[in-house]
């Protein structure tokens, strides 16, 4: 039976049935199916349908991986964006529709979290983008005040020894509003308060300050993580704390002490694993991952990575904590497998099965850039 015949058969079904079938499909075929009829196009472009389709995709298997700014060596051409289906041995290059093909425009960092299939690309000296890798939809982000200040400081910025914190990206769980957030330490760059917080507002297409900002300085190296409608950072205190920013009320609070103290910023990471806030400390020869129970405010040990074993891929000298990316379905196994990578070598993604204590390569290349997991969706921001 030809594709045309199958589409004609689908059109003869009640449209409610057609919708139920369509929402179980991936984003790529749905983009093509918009050409079948005006009714199909209207359905597929409906925000309600897109939410249901995204929920189905989340429940149907593992996420894909977006690899940002891959570069094999200093003389190689940078590949701005490539996407990988886990289990595949090759990745697919994604065109960047917002820029001319200029080398300097291909290098970005990426928010540690995706949100409804959207990711946030950023750089400390140039405009960023909220981007949907599946549909190629994007929204440019103008320079925030921090970026403008760093540009004004110029080359003197490097003499300050200032560590620029990473951009956070999340969603207000009550209103569904998406918010890029830049929280940064202020004193080194001539600002008065301990920290400054800027939030991007899509309704005005502008950044605005949040006041009061965070009461504690933050550790600049680990990226912020969004869990359950709040962004989280490590505080720069003798006793490391977890600082939370509620994306609805836009207020800060300390939610817990970390399960470790007096640590170097390169030895700790924060991540979202199955919608749970997790933190991890590298303490050679292991790296323990802790999961936070928001109900009783306690931490429990989720698993431990043996860095002696991973040194075969990551090198004998581990200078910073590896970064967990996602928990993968273990099929019949009770516990899911952990996907993680080395932030220094950026060549290999490894899967750890905590039940069997095994380690396997999920993907390997000369460069994997900055990887972030996402579920492909049709969602955009109007």
UniProtKB/Swiss-Prot annotation:
Q: Where on the tree of life does the source sit, at the highest rank?
A: Eukaryota
Q: Which keywords fit this entry according to its UniProt record?
A: Kelch repeat, Leucine-rich repeat, Repeat
- F-box domain location is 7-52
Q: Where are the Kelch repeats?
A: 180-227, 270-319
According to the UniProt entry, where is the signal peptide?
Answer: none
Coiled-coil positions are none
InterPro entries, alphabetized: F-box-assoc_dom_typ1 (IPR006527), F-box-assoc_interact_dom (IPR017451), F-box-like_dom_sf (IPR036047), F-box_dom (IPR001810), Gal_Oxase/kelch_b-propeller (IPR011043), Kelch-typ_b-propeller (IPR015915), SCF_F-box_component (IPR050796)
Q: Which SUPFAM superfamilies does the record cross-reference, listed alphabetically?
A: F-box domain, Galactose oxidase, central domain
Where the LRR repeats fall, as residue ranges, is 78-101, 239-262
Presence of the UniProt keyword Repeat in the record: yes
Pfam families attached here? F-box, FBA_1
**Record protein name field:** F-box/LRR-repeat/kelch-repeat protein At1g09650
Q: Which organism is it from?
A: Arabidopsis thaliana (Mouse-ear cress)
